[in-house]
Amino acid sequence: MTATEFKLSHLGLALHAYHWSATTPSNGKVIGIIHGLGEHGGRYVNVASYFSALGYEVFAFDHQGHGQSEGAKGTIQSWESFVSEISTFRAAIEGALDTPHKLILWGHSMGALVLLDYLSSRDEAETLTAAVVTSPPLKLGNPPPKILKSLASVVASIAPKLTKSNELKASDLSHDAQVVTSYQADPHNHDRVSMLLGYHMLDTANRLLAQPQSIPVPMLLMHGDADRICDISGSRQFANAVVGNVLLHEWPGLYHETHNEPTQFDVFAFAKTWLDALN
C-alpha cells in the first residue's frame, strides 16, 4: 500500500507526512498516527492498510529529528515545539480533507507520551473524537540510575543537542523476526536521543503520574504486559488515577509494538470495535 507523501511546515522545519486514502467508501473517520522514538510514520503502513480498508482516512508524520523530517537525529527545538507538532499535524489533515469527519489521534510509545501531554493540557484536544494510546513510556523497563535522573535537567540545559544511544533493543519490539529485521534495516530509523528530549520525556512522564490527569475525550490505552521497553505499570497507574472515559486493555504476552506482533489483527480488531461503539 502506497502513501501520498507531503511536507508540513512547523516552526521553520519541514516535517515529512503521509496520507493513506480509504480503499472502501469513506466512513467519515480519520486516524492520525504519532510515532515513537527513533522510528518514523512510514512504519505504520500495516495499521493504515487495515483501517483504510474499513473506510478510514489515515495520516502520519515524522517528528522533528526523525525519519525524513528536518532536524538533527534525535533532537528537538523544545518540548513545546514537539507537542505543538500535533496542532500543525491536525491543521494539515483539515486542509487535506474537504468533507466533515471525525478525528482520532493514535500515539505510540514516545508519540503516546506526547499525545497524553497534549490531551491533558490543550483546550483544542476537546474537539477530537477519540484517542488511542499504546505503550506509553510512563515508566521504563530499564530506567536510568537515580543519579542520572537528578543530573538530567543540568545536562539538558548545558548541552541540549548532545545525543546518545537510546539503547533500544530491536528484539524487544516484537515477537515477529521479520519486524525486527526490517526495523534494523530501515534507513529512516536511528538510535539517537538528545539530552533535551530525554530529559523532557522523563519529566513529562513524572508529571503525568504525579497527579490525576483529566482526559477530555474517550481514550483507549493498550499495552502488552511483556513490554520490556515501557513498563506496563506506568499505564496501570495512569489509568487508575485518570479523570475521564479511559479504557485500559492489557495484551498478555505482547511486546512493545502491539501493532506489529503476530497477533496484530487482534489488536486492530479490538480498537475497531471500541471505536465503533463510540457512535
Which role fits each region the language model picked out?
Residues 1-23:
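N-terminal cap/lid segment of alpha/beta-hydrolase-fold proteins
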Residues 36-39, 225:
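Active-site glycine-rich loops that stabilize anionic/oxyanionic intermediates
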Residues 38-40, 67-97, 101:
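Catalytic nucleophile-loop/oxyanion-hole region of alpha/beta-hydrolase
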Residues 43, 48-72:
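Conserved alpha/beta-hydrolase
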Residues 110-194:
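Alpha/beta-hydrolase-fold enzymes
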Residues 215, 221-223, 227:
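Short beta-strand/loop motif that positions the catalytic acidic residue
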Residues 217, 231-241:
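Short alpha-helix in the alpha/beta-hydrolase fold that links the catalytic acid
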Residues 245-279:
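Catalytic active-site module of serine/aspartate enzymes centered on a nucleophile-bearing elbow/loop
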